[in-house]
Amino acid sequence: MPEEYLNAQKMEKLERIKSRGINPYPSTFHPSHTSAQAVALLVEIETQENHLKEVLKLAGRIMNRRDMGKISFMDIRDGSGKMQIFFRQNDLDEASIELLKDLDLGDFIGVEGSLMRTRTGEPSLAATKVSMLSKSLLPLPEKWHGLQDVEKRYRQRYLDLISNADARQTFLTRSRVISVIRAFMNAKGFLEVETPVLQPEAGGALARPFITHHQALNCDFYMRIALELHLKRLIVGGFDRVYEIGRIFRNEGISTRHNPEFTMMESYQAYANYKDVMDFLEEMVSSVVKEISGGYTLPFGDITLDFTPPWPRLTMRDAVKQYAGIDFFDFPTKETLAAEMTRRKLKVDPAKDWGKLVDELVGEFVEPHLVQPTFLTDHPVAMSPLAKQKPEDPRLTERFEAICANMEIANAFSELNDPVEQRARFKEQLEKRSQLRTDESESVDEDFLAALAYGMPPTGGLGVGIDRLVMLFTNHDSIREVILFPALKDREDTKTQE
């Protein structure tokens, strides 16, 4: 960091602290309590009328300071919350009095003292000693308004977390959502596993991968675009129920709903089909909502989302008929469907195949109507290369997407376990990929096909978008709000302090 950006007054105070033989950045301090524990202890003492003056040690960042002659008040914050510290010069040793003069907002301090309440009833610690733990050399964002620049909030998330209680709560909620999902999966007998992030083949989804080169092996690897194929290998290997919560990487566009790296939970269950998985997802999400919110509803923007089971179920064909007025099977080729969409004044991307055009219709006409949790089922085969066909209509697959707040939050299907059919689907998928890009070599995942050839039982697979799910729990309409460090375009003027 260029020295000219450091606050001059803070630097002077830093030098004064050093001149008194104090290390402004000591290696440790051992608090006896968190702020939340200290407040709870004060309530317990008052309830029991126990007036013993136990000495506590607290630590945190100075967020507010008020000086009144020989008395000072500071609010310090740790990971559990805020605590007011009461300083009276008569109670402090000389070293603490001198140090007090050189403390600023943003500094980390350790304090020792006993609990009390002020005349206004504020829980406080009456300090008898203060220690310097870390001297802040840059000013914090303005106290009352926090950090308002949205892009700066994302680029400098640490300032956002310091300044905005809502941001801190968002990521506490995110952590809890993942923990509750994990507990639910474990209770249902699923084994949590870890599969490779670096893979020799980019499989499991139709998406552009990130490519990296392994120097020692002298070969390229792909960062995974899905968890699917390795998890299904484990079903082949004899684990009946497996899941993974992990990062996925797709070298594609950025939007309020898409980030190049994102978190998925994928699970695979032997001897289940997509209807079983539908019931399972419905139970899981509604249970997580109830565990975290106390009921089955969540506020989202101007509406209330109701996750009470059962959720509505709508076939994709019926949905597109209802909201777009098109039966896509009346237009069975890319050319005929594109012509019909053009006739209806819809923009058509000539690079997209028939399945992608159907997906466009769903995104344009269907998803805007699906606000409450809804299952969209029975996708065309062209859109679902890894899903089983429906026996009663081989043009369709046993697949569903869960839509909520106009966006997909989960995707699942009865897994294709016929190795011959899977090879044919892979080859078709490969042709589609080659049409999307010509700068990368592509190949079929032969090892996965070999695994299928040894036999995989009927299996229901599920993928849940953790980031989008957290958006619902935290009432955010942008994925960047729920990812600690979202991908952003490089900007030269943010490389130095603004």
UniProtKB/Swiss-Prot annotation:
InterPro entries: Aa-tRNA-synt_II (IPR004364), aa-tRNA-synth_II (IPR006195), aa-tRNA-synth_II/BPL/LPL (IPR045864), Lys-tRNA-ligase_II (IPR002313), Lys-tRNA-ligase_II_N (IPR044136), Lys-tRNA-synth_II_C (IPR018149), NA-bd_OB-fold (IPR012340), NA-bd_OB_tRNA (IPR004365). GO terms for biological process: lysyl-tRNA aminoacylation. It catalyses: tRNA(Lys) + L-lysine + ATP = L-lysyl-tRNA(Lys) + AMP + diphosphate. SUPFAM superfamilies: Class II aaRS and biotin synthetases, Nucleic acid-binding proteins. Binds 3 Mg(2+) ions per subunit. Gene3D superfamilies: Bira Bifunctional Protein, Domain 2, Nucleic acid-binding proteins. Its EC number is 6.1.1.6. It is found in: Cytoplasm. Keywords: Aminoacyl-tRNA synthetase, ATP-binding, Cytoplasm, Ligase, Magnesium, Metal-binding, Nucleotide-binding, Protein biosynthesis. Mg(2+) 2 binds at E408. It is an enzyme of class 6 (ligase). Transmembrane segments: none annotated. The keyword Metal-binding applies. Its cofactor is Mg(2+). One of its GO terms (cellular component) is cytosol. Mg(2+) 1 binds at E401, E408. One of its GO terms (molecular function) is ATP binding. The keyword Membrane does not apply. It holds the Pfam family tRNA-synt_2. Belongs to the class-II aminoacyl-tRNA synthetase family. Homodimer. This is Lysine--tRNA ligase. It comes from Dehalococcoides mccartyi (strain CBDB1).
